[in-house]
Amino acid sequence: MTIIKRLSSFVAAMLLAVGTMAQSNGSNSSYSRFGLGTLNDQSTGFNRAMGGVAQGIQDGNKVNMLNPASYSAIDSLSFIFDAGMGLQYGRLSGEGAKVTAFNATLEYVNAGFRLKRGLGLGIGFVPYSTIGYNFNTTTRVGSSYTSSQSITTKTTYYGNGGLHELYIGMGWNPFAGLSIGANIGYMWGDYDHSLAQNFYEGGESSKNYNAQNEVWSSNLKTYKLDIGAQYPIKLNKNNLLTIGATMSLGHDIKNEVKLIRYTSQGDTITSTAKKAFELPYIISAGASWKHKEQLTIAADYSLERWDGCKVPVSLATATENSIKVATDQYLNRHHITAGAEYINNPLGKYRQRIYYRLGVSYATPYVKINGHDGPNEYSIRAGVALPMTIRSKSFINASVEWLHRTSSTSGLITENYLMLHLGVTFNERWFEKLRFQ
């Protein structure tokens, strides 16, 4: 099969994956009701088990989309294809109630190859955020003046959507040491939320009255630009330190958001707002230490400047319906990751070529919930990469993750997830074969 045919097959596979991933949301978190949804981990097969570290990772056999400067180090003879999926079991608890949920989702599709010496290209598809929830609350609000029966309200919340990113990037090594790179991404997705509220006199089996509904909807389309740099420092024969940093440019999302309210009197009130969403500026930095091509230890820190970003909120009353573009609903998010990878002998027997990985991460909330800070996130991960054959550079990646999402604010839900991440990294020496042909 020629290189062109293989590239055509890859493009077809990626388009199929894009369609599959865009149809799935993989979430049951009630916290995805706020902001742009729950923010996704965009790490891939090799670094997902390492906590998501990426800034100082530069490897010729891996596609590190979180720092595009790393593309400059891709092996000159290889075409790398990386794809992964996740299985998630969640346990959500709060105020005496417990709910379990199961989800499966395609997590990423990436590829990379070298264009010429010191110049590499990366392309791929990853989810940016996820909206997915369906829950209800029942509250006693008083008693009827005529029957003295209790009046309760049942509110059902439903949401679906999230943002997806299709990106292409290049990494360049202009001179010995320094590498620079950039990703430009096209982002799109749905922002769909609904609220249905019913009042009951004497219980849900009785006739309801004064029902009202709200439906939020927006079809979001925008861009994302990430700029990165890396610099390796050879400490001695056996030790290499690589430092790296990236910056993501924040900007308005110009699409319109619509709020439709259906009142108990049968009226429909519609309100719209433009430029109601915004992406934050993000600054990330980190470093990795590699010892004898066997042990890698890395750590990253990211600051996401969400504070002051725009988000729509409702100003609906009994007779009016309007949207306010608020700038006080977000918090700056701090994200810390650390991880390690060990391989006994990259050129040894099969068992010696298995990668063992560990990682942890911590993130503060980016949204406020009823004026209080949202949940913090804690994660512990472990995994392996198994060679497909004795001498192959292609691997099967597998890792498990425990994610704990909780807030110090009373009354908020605590979420615990056990996740299994499975992926494959194909590393074929296409261009070497072409040379012999």
Listing of model-derived features with the role each one plays in the protein:
Residues V11-A12, L39:
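A periodicity- and composition-biased signal for non-globular, repetitive helical segments
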Residues M1-V11:
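Bacterial N-terminal signal peptides that target proteins for export
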Residues A12-L15, Q352:
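PAS-family sensory domains
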Residues A17-G19:
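N-terminal signal peptide c-region/cleavage motif recognized by signal peptidases
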Residues R6, M14-L15, Q294:
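Acidic/proline-rich low-complexity IDRs
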Residues Q23-Q437:
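Subset of outer-membrane beta-barrel
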